[in-house]
Every structure is written in structure tokens, then in C-alpha cells.
């Protein structure tokens, strides 16, 4: 695929309509340009854009989220949600909230999957009434 818009349109053609259309928008171009391009290409069927910028490129910041939201709104895509992901933990989520970043969904992965195990037992006991 040569663009995120083309990839998202292909996904849209082949997936059942009940599957949400959320596009990862930091692959080929700037996140803002890709977000607007995909929203335009999807003609009202895009539910969200996912920002997952790697740390080598500055990672997802509150300013980036605000800029994406401003451009989506300016272009008439106020209903498109913004998903933030990429190394999120409680501190990073608090940062976005404190900065007033308009994140609709926080996608948390490795913080949960890499969590320290909690040792416990689950015993069954019969209790007479």
C-alpha cells in the first residue's frame, strides 16, 4: 500500500461493517496530514485515528493530539475519535489529562501485559448451612 488512506479503504472494503474503522496514522506521512487524508477518503465512515508515534520521532505528545484534533475539526471531522497509544502507563495518561489533550481513547498494552504477576490462590471450600 502506498498510503494509509488506501490501506484504510482496503480494510473498509473487506471487513464487516460492524468492525470499527480506526486508522493508524503515523506510517507514511505526518500524523496530521494522514489523519485528514484518511478521514476525507473514508467519507464519514472513519470512527477514529490512532496516534502511536515512536519515541525516535518524538512520541505522541499533548500538542500533537491537540493539533490533530484542531485539523480534523477544521476539515469537518469532529466525530472522528483520537486514540493515543505507544508505551502508555498511568503517568503518561495523567500527562495527557493534565495538559488538556483531547484524547478519546487510551490504548494501553505493554503496561498491562508486562505487569508483575500477583501470586494468589483460589481455594474452594464447602460451607454447611
Annotate each predicted stretch with a short phrase.
Residues 59-80, 85-129:
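Gly/Ser/Thr/Ala-enriched C-terminal appendages of enzymes
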Residues 1-75, 90-92:
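Buried, small/hydrophobic-residue-enriched core segments of structured protein domains
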